[in-house]
Amino acid sequence: MSGKDRIEIFPSRMAQTIMKARLKGAQTGRNLLKKKSDALTLRFRQILKKIIETKMLMGEVMREAAFSLAEAKFTAGDFSTTVIQNVNKAQVKIRAKKDNVAGVTLPVFEHYHEGTDSYELTGLARGGEQLAKLKRNYAKAVELLVELASLQTSFVTLDEAIKITNRRVNAIEHVIIPRIERTLAYIITELDEREREEFYRLKKIQEKKKILKEKSEKDLEQRRAAGEVLEPANLLAEEKDEDLLFE
């Protein structure tokens, strides 16, 4: 396993604990991002469906508004000069709000009326009904246009947010988590190898001590058999174990 495939870290119990915590954190982050992506995708599909419905309705409303304009011009004559002369400031205005979906801020536009209707008395002489119908149809068209602008802006914002979230999920799932898992496997392998080496070393030391003990007991028996007087061992004296070397 090359160093590029795993995180450079000294194998130890502490490193193993750290890697386990990092792995758990990465898995939790991946799961949360997947839930976020699912929530964004659900809202994305809802907005897409709403855009299609609004565009279909928009076509009908604009067609009806065009017919109303033709009827009003036929009945009341050319009233464009009157409209232009009465223009002072916009009566229909737009304000923006913010909506939050799984941490993503979406702009929401809504229209509102400000001031009085400058064209309230237009059409009193003739064509009043057609002009009123014309204003209603174009007011509906403005409302749908504002709604469509809000939906399309949210659509683009969500599309970009979903792509970014999915890229993060893929990076965690296919790069970060496998790298941590390989690092954890490396640490476990190294620790197991150390334990085997330590076990083998202790086993050889015990075997060496056993051989020395048997040899010492055998020498003691031979000396007793030869009639030598043996001094009792001083239990309080400091004894230093002989360094045991083995091949």
UniProtKB/Swiss-Prot annotation:
Coiled coil: none
MF annotations from Gene Ontology: proton-transporting ATPase activity, rotational mechanism
Topology in the lipid bilayer: Peripheral membrane protein
Protein role: Subunit of the V1 complex of vacuolar(H+)-ATPase (V-ATPase), a multisubunit enzyme composed of a peripheral complex (V1) that hydrolyzes ATP and a membrane integral complex (V0) that translocates protons. V-ATPase is responsible for acidifying and maintaining the pH of intracellular compartments and in some cell types, is targeted to the plasma membrane, where it is responsible for acidifying the extracellular environment. May play a role in cilium biogenesis through regulation of the transport and the localization of proteins to the cilium.
Family: Belongs to the V-ATPase D subunit family.
Subunit structure: V-ATPase is a heteromultimeric enzyme made up of two complexes: the ATP-hydrolytic V1 complex and the proton translocation V0 complex. The V1 complex consists of three catalytic AB heterodimers that form a heterohexamer, three peripheral stalks each consisting of EG heterodimers, one central rotor including subunits D and F, and the regulatory subunits C and H. The proton translocation complex V0 consists of the proton transport subunit a, a ring of proteolipid subunits c9c'', rotary subunit d, subunits e and f, and the accessory subunits ATP6AP1/Ac45 and ATP6AP2/PRR. Interacts with SNX10.
Name of this protein: V-type proton ATPase subunit D
Organism in which the protein naturally occurs: Homo sapiens (Human)
Lineage of producing organism: Eukaryota, Metazoa, Chordata, Craniata, Vertebrata
